[in-house]
C-alpha cells in the first residue's frame, strides 16, 4: 500500500492487542495506530492472570523464547512494581511422566534451572507428591500490571485507544484503515467470519492472603498456586465450551479442596479476590494475513489475524506479535 502515513487499527486492548501495537509502533514509527476495544480493561481476559511463563505446545517454543528475552530485558531494566514482571521458581507435579517430558521439550532450554526432582526432594517438599516433578525458574507477568504498563508505553507514543464495539472488519476498513490487526481473542474467529474453531475455556481463580508462599506449584496443569506481588493466585478451572462467568460455591469448594491437598498447612485461606474469564481456546494460534474487499465501499484492505493463544497469551504474546508485525509490514509493502 502506498499511504505515506499508514492507518492501522488493532482490535483488542488485552495482552495480545497491546503487544501487537507496541511491536508495530516500533517497526513502523510513522504509522497512525488506533486500538479499538469493546470493554474496560478490568473486564478483559488479560486483567487477572499471574502470567507464569509456561508453554503448552512445542510448536510455540520459538515464540516463547522471544517473549522470555523480552521479560528478561524488562526484569533487568525496569521496576517490577511498574511492569508486573518478576522472577519466580517452583514446581509442576504429575503422575504422567510424558506430560512433564513434553514440558521439557517445549521450554526446558529457555527457562532457568529446569530439572526433574529426585525422590528425596519430592518426599521432603510435598505432603502427597505426584510420581514425578519438575523444577524451573522463570518470569511471571501479572496481567493487572503488565498490560497497563504496555498501554502506558503506547499512550506516550500518542497511540489512540477507543472503546467501541466492533462487529465487522469491513466497517473498520471503511472508516479509513489500511490494515486491521485482529487481536479479538475468543471472538477473533467470529470477527474473521471464516473461523469456527475458537471456543471458550472457562477459568476461575481465587487470590488468597498468603505472603509467605513464594513458589509456584502445579499439579497436572489445572491445580496451581502462583505468587503475585500482594497475593497468591489459586486455581483453576479449565472448562471447555462453557460461557458462564458467575463464580459459584461449587467452583470455590473444588478449587480450595485441590489447593489444600497441595498445601495442607494453608487451610481456611483468606480469599481477598475472585476472578473469572473465558480464555480463547484454539488448536493453533492464528497468525495470518488476508486481502479483503469491503462490501460497503468496495475498499481493498488487509487483515492480519493474531488470536487463539489459549492460556499462553502472556507467554507467547511478544513472540507472536513479532511475526504478526512482519505480516503488517509486508501488507504495507515495507
Curated annotation (Swiss-Prot):
Give the catalysed reaction(s), semicolon-separated.
Answer: D-aspartate + O2 + H2O = oxaloacetate + H2O2 + NH4(+); D-glutamate + O2 + H2O = H2O2 + 2-oxoglutarate + NH4(+)
Membrane as a keyword of this entry, yes or no, is no
**Key words of the record:** Cytoplasm, FAD, Flavoprotein, Oxidoreductase
Enzyme nomenclature, EC number: 1.4.3.1
The record's disulfide annotation reads: none
**Subcellular localization:** Cytoplasm
| Deletion consequences | Mutant worms have decreased egg-laying capacity at 20 degrees Celsius and decreased hatching rate and smaller brood size at 25 degrees Celsius. Mutant worms also exhibit decreased fertilization rates but do not show any change in physical appearance.
The Gene Ontology biological process annotation of the record reads: aspartate catabolic process; D-amino acid catabolic process
Keyword field contains Flavoprotein: yes
**Sequence positions that bind FAD:** 38-39, 46, 310, 315
Q: What class of enzyme is it?
A: oxidoreductase
Q: Which family does it belong to?
A: Belongs to the DAMOX/DASOX family.
Function recorded in the entry: Selectively catalyzes the oxidative deamination of acidic amino acids. May play a role in the egg-laying events and early development of the worm, in addition to quality control of the germ cells.
Q: Tell me the protein's name.
A: D-aspartate oxidase 2
Gene designation per UniProt? ddo-2
Amino acid at each position: 500500500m502506498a499511504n505515506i502515513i499508514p492507518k492501522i487499527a488493532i482490535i483488542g486492548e488485552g495482552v495480545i492487542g497491546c503487544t501487537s501495537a507496541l511491536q508495530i509502533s516500533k517497526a513502523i514509527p510513522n504509522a497512525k495506530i488506533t486500538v479499538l476495544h469493546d470493554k474496560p480493561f478490568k473486564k478483559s481476559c488479560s486483567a487477572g492472570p499471574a502470567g507464569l511463563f509456561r508453554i503448552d505446545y512445542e510448536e510455540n517454543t520459538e515464540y516463547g523464547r522471544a517473549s522470555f528475552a523480552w521479560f528478561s530485558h524488562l526484569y533487568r531494566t525496569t521496576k517490577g512494581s511498574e511492569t508486573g514482571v518478576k522472577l519466580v521458581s517452583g514446581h509442576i507435579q504429575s503422575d504422567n511422566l510424558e506430560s512433564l517430558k513434553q514440558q521439557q521439550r517445549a521450554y526446558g532450554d529457555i527457562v532457568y534451572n529446569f530439572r526433574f526432582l529426585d525422590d528425596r526432594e519430592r518426599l521432603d517438599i510435598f505432603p502427597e507428591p505426584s510420581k514425578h516433578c519438575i523444577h524451573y525458574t522463570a518470569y511471571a507477568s501479572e496481567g493487572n500490571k503488565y498490560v497497563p504498563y504496555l498501554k502506558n508505553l503506547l499512550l506516550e507514543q500518542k497511540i489512540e485507544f477507543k472503546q467501541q464495539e466492533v462487529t465487522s472488519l469491513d466497517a473498520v476498513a471503511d472508516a479509513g484503515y489500511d490494515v486491521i490487526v485482529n487481536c479479538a481473542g475468543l471472538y477473533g474467529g467470529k470477527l474473521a467470519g471464516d473461523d469456527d474453531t475458537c471456543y471458550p475455556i472457562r477459568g476461575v481463580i481465587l487470590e488468597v492472603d498468603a505472603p509467605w508462599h513464594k513458589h509456584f506449584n502445579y499439579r497436572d496443569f489445572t491445580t496451581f498456586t502462583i505468587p503475585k506481588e500482594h497475593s497468591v493466585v489459586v486455581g483453576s478451572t479449565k472448562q471447555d465450551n462453557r460461557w458462564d462467568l458467575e463464580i459459584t460455591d461449587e467452583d470455590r469448594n473444588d478449587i480450595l479442596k485441590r489447593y489444600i491437598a497441595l498445601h495442607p498447612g494453608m487451610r481456611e485461606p483468606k480469599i481477598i479476590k475472585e476472578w473469572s474469564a473465558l480464555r480463547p481456546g484454539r488448536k493453533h494460534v492464528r497468525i495470518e494475513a488476508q486481502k479483503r474487499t469491503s462490501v460497503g465501499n468496495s475498499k481493498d484492505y488487509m487483515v492480519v489475524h493474531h488470536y487463539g493463544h489459549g492460556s499462553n497469551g502472556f507467554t507467547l504474546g511478544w513472540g507472536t506479535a513479532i511475526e504478526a508485525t512482519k505480516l503488517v509490514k509486508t501488507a504495507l509493502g515495507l
